Amino acid sequence: MSALSSENINGVYIPSALLIFGTFIVKKEFVPYAVALTAILAGLKLFTGGSKPRKVLNPTEFQEFVLKEKTDISHNVCIYRFALPRPADILGLPIGQHISLAATIEGQPKEVVRSYTPISSDNEAGYFDLLVKAYPQGNISKYLTTLKIGDTMKVRGPKGAMVYTPNMCRHIGMIAGGTGITPMLQIIKAVIRNRPRNGGNDTTKLDLIFANVNPDDILLKEELDKLAAEDPDFNIYYVLNNPPQGWTGGVGFVTPEMIKEHLPAPASDVKILLCGPPPMISAMKKATESLGYTKARPVSKLEDQVFCF
């Protein structure tokens, strides 16, 4: 925010001038104290940007954000926390949308850009978190692993066709694979945060099928299980390619039978969300169509019954 913005002129400079002028008229000897007080208050307001959170995302221009924390989740998965310019700032990302990360990668002819969905929300001011799995051929994911605390990352957004609004449908079924859980988690947390018991009005039912290869690949399982335990209208069904002994979830690939058993049946007030590796998404598009859901488009739109991130 500019120091000479109308908000600062009307909210800082004019009130400060009136306070000093009024003090001068009433009691001149108190003027230095009035000046000192207004300087402190004005400085605090200018530094924090006022009490209203400031949205920092720019959809047309990349901005650089400083890496402040790295938390290893596994040998190839990490949560990267980037600081926003001010403690009260928020990213300004609508629920369901994502951001673009850009970097100049050695050996690439031009700047590489990839999309990611933060696992944090605008309820958490001053930073945003990205859960990223590093792939051997992943340009941006590998680049992120080289960042040190204090380094910066170029970010632009928001982008995407999905903008979740409370009660946009009666029942949402989700199928996620690997790091495809990130947009699902964003929506799940938003729905539960806005439940009637929490002072909101969202009564949307949520069912999630979360597929992975090994037990250790189930990202954010503790957080997901906690959310499901707290919310009777949110259910999870885990699927593993290599299940451990005594496993009670699904085994192998997600099948039409699993979808039929664990997700809502096709209806006008039902939406199915898909996010995961391309081969999985291709298979899930065919599976949902075979079960009577509307055929997924190559590029999803908000109104689609089957939406692919």
Curated annotation (Swiss-Prot):
InterPro entries: CBR-like, Cbr1-like_FAD-bd_dom, FAD-bd_FR_type, Flavoprot_Pyr_Nucl_cyt_Rdtase, FNR_nucleotide-bd, OxRdtase_FAD/NAD-bd, Riboflavin_synthase-like_b-brl. Keywords: FAD, Flavoprotein, Membrane, Mitochondrion, Mitochondrion outer membrane, NAD, Oxidoreductase, Transferase, Transmembrane, Transmembrane helix. FAD binds at residues 145-160, 171-208. It is a single-pass membrane protein. It comes from the Eukaryota. Its cofactor is FAD. GO terms for biological process: protein histidyl modification to diphthamide; tRNA wobble base 5-methoxycarbonylmethyl-2-thiouridinylation. One of its GO terms (molecular function) is NADH dehydrogenase activity. It catalyses: 2 Fe(III)-[cytochrome b5] + NADH = 2 Fe(II)-[cytochrome b5] + NAD(+) + H(+); 2 Fe(3+)-[Dph3] + NADH = 2 Fe(2+)-[Dph3] + NAD(+) + H(+). One of its GO terms (cellular component) is mitochondrial outer membrane. The keyword DNA damage does not apply. Residues 60-165 form the FAD-binding FR-type domain. Pathway: Protein modification; peptidyl-diphthamide biosynthesis. Its EC number is 1.6.2.2. It is found in: Mitochondrion outer membrane. The chain crosses the membrane at residues 30-50. Its main location: mitochondrion. NADH-dependent reductase for dph3 and cytochrome b5. Required for the first step of diphthamide biosynthesis, a post-translational modification of histidine which occurs in elongation factor 2. Dph1 and dph2 transfer a 3-amino-3-carboxypropyl (ACP) group from S-adenosyl-L-methionine (SAM) to a histidine residue, the reaction is assisted by a reduction system comprising dph3 and a NADH-dependent reductase, predominantly cbr1. By reducing dph3, also involved in the formation of the tRNA wobble base modification mcm5s 2U (5-methoxycarbonylmethyl-2-thiouridine), mediated by the elongator complex. Belongs to the flavoprotein pyridine nucleotide cytochrome reductase family. Monomer. Component of the 2-(3-amino-3-carboxypropyl)histidine synthase complex composed of dph1, dph2, dph3 and a NADH-dependent reductase, predominantly cbr1. This is NADH-cytochrome b5 reductase 1. It comes from Neosartorya fischeri (strain ATCC 1020 / DSM 3700 / CBS 544.65 / FGSC A1164 / JCM 1740 / NRRL 181 / WB 181) (Aspergillus fischerianus).
